[in-house]
Amino acid sequence: MEKLFVPSFPKTFLNYQTPAKVENSPELHPKSRKKNLSFTKKKEPNIIPDEQFDYLCRNGSLLEAEKALDSLFQQGSKVKRSTYLKLLESCIDSGSIHLGRILHARFGLFTEPDVFVETKLLSMYAKCGCIADARKVFDSMRERNLFTWSAMIGAYSRENRWREVAKLFRLMMKDGVLPDDFLFPKILQGCANCGDVEAGKVIHSVVIKLGMSSCLRVSNSILAVYAKCGELDFATKFFRRMRERDVIAWNSVLLAYCQNGKHEEAVELVKEMEKEGISPGLVTWNILIGGYNQLGKCDAAMDLMQKMETFGITADVFTWTAMISGLIHNGMRYQALDMFRKMFLAGVVPNAVTIMSAVSACSCLKVINQGSEVHSIAVKMGFIDDVLVGNSLVDMYSKCGKLEDARKVFDSVKNKDVYTWNSMITGYCQAGYCGKAYELFTRMQDANLRPNIITWNTMISGYIKNGDEGEAMDLFQRMEKDGKVQRNTATWNLIIAGYIQNGKKDEALELFRKMQFSRFMPNSVTILSLLPACANLLGAKMVREIHGCVLRRNLDAIHAVKNALTDTYAKSGDIEYSRTIFLGMETKDIITWNSLIGGYVLHGSYGPALALFNQMKTQGITPNRGTLSSIILAHGLMGNVDEGKKVFYSIANDYHIIPALEHCSAMVYLYGRANRLEEALQFIQEMNIQSETPIWESFLTGCRIHGDIDMAIHAAENLFSLEPENTATESIVSQIYALGAKLGRSLEGNKPRRDNLLKKPLGQSWIEVRNLIHTFTTGDQSKLCTDVLYPLVEKMSRLDNRSDQYNGELWIEEEGREETCGIHSEKFAMAFGLISSSGASKTTIRILKNLRMCRDCHDTAKYVSKRYGCDILLEDTRCLHHFKNGDCSCKDYW
């Protein structure tokens, strides 16, 4: 073959070292020097015979060879070109990069270095694993031929650096060097593995121009590019036009069909393949098995694996590994471990990927015993030094909570990569050991390994889970400046979710706004993290802001986002807009129906809730736990005890669901609201739910509203025994005991221990006006309250004298009376809402309170809604009150 190369401008390949100056030699100056004519031939440098170096290299005496080279250099002697090449070959065989570097530094030991010798030097560096040095030699070469380019491309191929292979091809074309039929497949392999289909198309055109289309090896490589890059149409057309097709070509096009989910067509191709006289080989079967697993059809893949035996083809390690990884990918992890066991029984030796897959299954299942067994197998079979196996073991032990074992494996991994460090850091973060995680995070950088985006995100997530959002924010701010790693959408989502998790909603919303001005826009995860934080009356405006972002980003096409919006609008007080979103949804699942049904129940609208329930059943949607608890509450609002009881008993009988605490609590509410307290108490005893605080709180509400002091005392005694340290509970119990004593009831239970020192919880209310949240406290003495709000509060309040029993109701409140503790916070909030919205034709005042609203404030809110013609939405710890025209949605039961 003709040598193809393009000369380039001369470059200094290396700085030659001049021989040492001979001592005591006279200094000769040009001017005084006389010409000395001599007709004798100049003496050539000493040439060391090849036999000496051959002997040293054959016996592995590379140290002696190195000394001999140094001696030659000092003497100014030379070695033959063939000797130098043999020395380089010895370095390759022995992997002696040290001697190789010495040979490079002594490049002047032979007189005429050429492109072949330089290419050999390049190969030496590449095969010894020093690809950066190989590239330096390549870039410094005075001329490069086809063999030079082949050596460099081969070096990158061995390192799986496929993008560099594609880049070198482009440089090669610029230099005017054309690949041959041996180099084309290597370059095409690089294009296929890095997904560079455009480079593959360029090579395809070059191949046609060079007339190499008939070369089967090259054609198969072109087909592989189209197949692996997902270009099914190109692959099919090229395959059909191939003059000659061997089993490799058929396998490539089969792979293309399987990767594109066309498995039935792939099976038909196999039949066509057999008609052409080509028998499907092991690789063909493996492709089909892998394809079915990828599609989630593991049973079909298993059938194929059994069927191949009837064709006389025995499954190899790749078949078993494809089956094991396919089962894991499709969530069938126990079956995958069983397949791993069967593989051993079949006498097939696993490879590193098989071990890694088995460890992954153990990790997901958190079966530490089986994981330890796989670890032992990895040690016995020599896979423990494989970095991928080591990484999977670290991950498995970390997820199983065995951090000491994980650390032992981590420390034993010799060539740790970023994933090794990430696995151990993740383990520490998940266990709450952020200090140890940060120590590794620092050590990783000291080891000249830069943390990637996963490392930073893991550290941020760890601090957030530990409740230390300050450290999380510090890392969030440092990562781009110090770590040179750009934040991604997941980073923003983590920090936003962290602030929400730790109760810092305002900071989370501010970050959300900043995120929209960054390179990475919010996604569905961002929205789903934020919306629950807005699911209260103060979040109404923020919900609309988030909804605007959803529309701008076209996230409303995501079903989960629409469900969340339906739920959040209802909880933030806008049930009508919640219904609008619901009606606009083409597909409605059980979560969609539950969101609006629950919203109607929250707003006290039992009629629409029951109508939706019937409509849902008509459309064939089966109710779940959440649906049924909402419907029992709806019947409670309606006062229809018998229908509520039917729904409760249908939970187990019709829907085969075990009734949960939420259903029992709803039933107690149902009985209590209907003043059927004896039945409620009997239900509590029958269901054996006496140890649940929410049950007695619901029961006590019925006792309080209907004025049954004896039942109230019974409920109070149970509440106090369950939560003796709860201040709110103790306050209520104290009031009931005091009222019972006043009414002459004998008290057998233990009284609260802090009767004299008891302080009731401080009432607080919040209201949003002009995008600012204002806080008011009971007995507030701020300038705003004393100068502006007190007169209005006095004006709008009905100051009736109240007794311990008001219309038959027991006067038992979480908050102290206004005569002793001052005006309650919600009255200040209502007054501030009225002042701030004066002049508005239709006003809705939204207030959030931390305690149960007392009867006096409840009556005041009804009066204000009628007197001033405004709607008041007030959410306390019991329910959402909607005051309108002098009425409340709770029907005075809360």
From Swiss-Prot:
Pfam families: DYW_deaminase (PF14432), PPR (PF01535), PPR_2 (PF13041). GO terms for cellular component: chloroplast; cytoplasm; nucleus. GO terms for biological process: RNA modification. InterPro entries: DYW_dom, Pentatricopeptide_rpt, PPR_At4g14850-like_plant, TPR-like_helical_dom_sf. GO terms for molecular function: mRNA binding; zinc ion binding. Residues 771-801 are annotated as: Type E(+) motif. Residues 695-770 are annotated as: Type E motif. Residues 803-894 are annotated as: Type DYW motif. Keywords: Repeat. Disulfide bonds: none annotated. PPR repeats lie at residues 80-110, 114-144, 145-179, 180-214, 215-245, 246-280, 281-315, 316-350, 351-385, 386-416, 417-451, 452-486, 488-522, 523-557, 558-588, 589-623, 624-659, 660-694. Belongs to the PPR family. PCMP-H subfamily. This is Pentatricopeptide repeat-containing protein At1g19720.
